[in-house]
């Protein structure tokens, strides 16, 4: 599977917002609903939103009795938004139906997932629920332990099987009807995964596919050589030392991937994305969430970068996922990457907008008011929360994020093969554990970096196309193709920073007779640098900088070191983004999240002093000069603060910025 070179060809969503629906909207064409559509569409236009995305009526087949009315509502929404040049994308879950099985589940569902818009069948009616002649209970996944219908504890839902041809035909017919009824501009199909994790599915279609594709029989649940320890969450089940189980992991991904391919065949000239908002950790194997295997049939990439809780201030934890998704989008013909942020109050909406600007991606502002402990009575509509940031951007700092070029000094490898084969080192650490640790330390040291994924790692020409060093940390699984490319890169003077183990298993997860690292070390390549395999911190990076192995373009010389700094090139212009790491959450006094996520974020405060900061920037090769700069932020409106610029010679420029009273974000341009 190769990365895509064909350029992205659809509309580019830059300022997205959720079109939040409520149960009363199913009463369309009631005059109240029609007027509400008109009012909100005008609000979206005034907020500078270019793309609205449906948010509600989510578990779509729970509304199969009301599709005519629902589609009439959506057509009305499309028509009204199109008057303002705003695109409208649908967004729904295709393979879940809400079926709470106990009173506790029932009340939990109605407390934690009200934003779905809930109208599920009662237990008696559920037996007869169907669409296009397909009874829902006949197309559900089956539990591997007893053959009963699978169940998602996260969503109190039953799940349709991605391999069941009746479900696939039902979904296909629904999509054809939807596009006939509604002039949708694009689509996000959610839950293209398996929320039963490894507890499902043992239906005949899945077992037959396992036999056809891998020549294997699915073992009984009692076979611990295959299923491993099943006492924990089903995402943790499975014995990765068994190649048959590793094939089962791939089977689950293949099943979802083929479903996505079918959906794409129906969409025609419309972009498709799915909810695959994380890429790195191994537990995603159980959920069959694997964007790198899905990307061939997707057009847009969504990254779910933050929520509404007080923990949102710890934004550095989210960056690794955000930037690897951005790299995937870049290798889908430079498709837009979209950062989804959930907001309750003005500050969290501003934070989501700021994160998107800092990462150089499109912003999707949304909310999860259906997951709040109660209605505080002061909740704004999402376009009202988003308008100040969008309008400031349009007026003072318009940037096409999809055209920006990231400036970086290091390539950080995240090798999908490690995750897929269940690799852990002797300390039990995943490859992703070390990768995400590098991401965090690069934020703290202002080293520019990008991700290098498994496909690029197997391509010597792409490795040699840049002179930035490559970091390989805890990369236990390495394919023969990847190893060959790495050797060619080193033989041609490339630099590799390596923390062992490396290549103790092959690309399919089988143990090698001898780790590949031994051959590399014996070859004594000048560009191979071995580092401690336990420590990823500022001291480690400082040593690599001191030795000239990493050559950062940004070097702070004065002021507090609490600002994260990124440089991006827009056409012939350099832009510097700064984002505060020293922020503290101000929680709402009573409002909490329903899924044990803690207090809702009400506001933030900066814990640094806001003193002037100075950086020496190496502009060699990226700009002839960098001067006449201003510092701006939505927090100071139309004011442009002067930036002191000193030309130090040798393509180095010293810039001094005054971030006084800036809580979160600013830009130098």
Pin down the residues of each PLM region:
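Mature N-terminal, pre-catalytic/accessory segment of carbohydrate-active enzymes
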Residues: 1-99, 108-110, 169, 406, ...
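Short, acidic/polar
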Residues: 26-44, 167-178, 283-294, 348-353
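Catalytic domains of carbohydrate-active enzymes, especially glycoside hydrolases
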Residues: 32-60, 181-184, 298-301, 352, ...
């Amino acid at each position: 599977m190769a990365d895509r070179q064909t350029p992205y060809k659809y509309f580019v969503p830059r300022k997205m917002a959720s079109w939040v629906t409520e149960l009363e909207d199913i009463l369309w064409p009631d005059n109240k609903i029609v007027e509400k559509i008109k009012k909100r569409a005008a609000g979206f236009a005034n907020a500078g939103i270019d793309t609205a995305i449906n948010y509600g009526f989510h578990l779509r087949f729970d509304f199969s009795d009301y599709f005519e009315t629902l589609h009439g509502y959506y057509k009305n929404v499309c028509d009204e938004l199109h008057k303002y040049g705003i695109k409208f994308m649908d967004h729904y879950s295709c393979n879940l139906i809400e079926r709470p099985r106990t009173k506790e589940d029932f009340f939990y569902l109605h407390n934690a997932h009200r934003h779905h818009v809930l109208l599920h069948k009662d237990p008696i009616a559920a037996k007869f629920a169907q669409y296009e002649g397909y009874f829902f209970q006949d197309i559900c996944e089956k539990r591997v332990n007893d053959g009963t219908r699978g169940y998602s504890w996260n969503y109190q839902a039953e799940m349709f099987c991605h391999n069941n041809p009746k479900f696939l035909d039902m979904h296909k017919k629904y999509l054809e009807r939807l596009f006939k009824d509604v002039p949708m501009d694009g689509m996000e199909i959610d839950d293209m995964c398996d929320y039963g994790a490894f507890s499902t599915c043992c239906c005949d279609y899945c077992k037959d596919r396992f036999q056809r594709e891998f020549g294997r029989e699915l073992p009984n649940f009692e076979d611990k050589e295959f299923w491993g320890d099943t006492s924990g969450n089903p995402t943790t089940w499975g014995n990765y030392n068994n190649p048959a189980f590793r094939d089962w992991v791939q089977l689950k991904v293949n099943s979802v991937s083929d479903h996505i391919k079918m959906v794409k065949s129906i969409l025609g000239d419309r972009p498709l994305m799915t909810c695959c908002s994380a890429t790195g950790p191994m537990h995603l194997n159980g959920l069959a969430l694997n964007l790198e295997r899905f990307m061939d049939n997707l057009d847009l990439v969504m990254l779910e970068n933050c929520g509404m809780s007080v923990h949102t201030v710890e934004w550095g934890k989210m960056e690794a996922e955000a930037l690897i998704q951005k790299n995937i989008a870049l290798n889908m013909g430079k498709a837009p990457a979209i950062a989804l942020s959930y907001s309750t109050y003005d500050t969290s909406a501003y934070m989501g907008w700021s994160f998107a600007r800092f990462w150089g991606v499109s912003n999707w502002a949304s909310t999860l008011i259906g997951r709040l402990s109660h209605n505080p009575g002061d909740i704004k509509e999402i376009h009202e929360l988003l308008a100040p940031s969008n309008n400031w951007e349009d007026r003072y700092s318009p940037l096409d994020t999809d055209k920006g070029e990231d400036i970086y000094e290091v390539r950080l490898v995240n090798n999908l093969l490690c995750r897929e084969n269940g690799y852990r080192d002797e300390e039990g650490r995943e490859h992703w554990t070390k990768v995400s640790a590098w991401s965090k330390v690069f934020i703290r040291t202002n080293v520019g970096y990008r991700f290098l994924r498994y496909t690029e790692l197997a391509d010597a020409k792409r490795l040699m196309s840049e002179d930035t060093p490559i970091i390989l940390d805890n990369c236990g699984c390495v394919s023969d193709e990847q190893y060959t490319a790495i050797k060619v890169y080193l033989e041609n003077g490339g630099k590799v920073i390596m923390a062992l183990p490396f290549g103790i298993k092959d690309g399919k997860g089988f143990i090698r007779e001898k780790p590949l690292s031994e051959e590399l070390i014996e070859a004594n390549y000048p560009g191979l640098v071995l580092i401690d395999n336990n420590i990823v911190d500022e001291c480690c990076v400082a040593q690599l900088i001191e030795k000239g192995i990493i050559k950062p373009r940004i070097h702070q010389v004065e002021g507090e070191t609490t600002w994260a700094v990124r440089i991006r090139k827009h056409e012939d212009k350099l832009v510097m983004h700064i984002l505060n790491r020293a922020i503290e959450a101000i929680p709402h006094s009573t409002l909490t999240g329903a899924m044990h996520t803690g207090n809702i974020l009400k506001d933030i405060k900066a814990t640094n002093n806001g003193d002037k900061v100075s950086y020496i920037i190496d502009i060699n090769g990226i700009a002839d000069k960098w001067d006449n700069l201003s510092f701006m932020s939505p927090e100071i409106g139309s004011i442009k603060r002067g930036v002191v610029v000193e030309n130090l010679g040798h393509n180095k420029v010293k810039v001094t910025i005054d971030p006084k009273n800036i809580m979160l974000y600013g830009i130098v341009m």
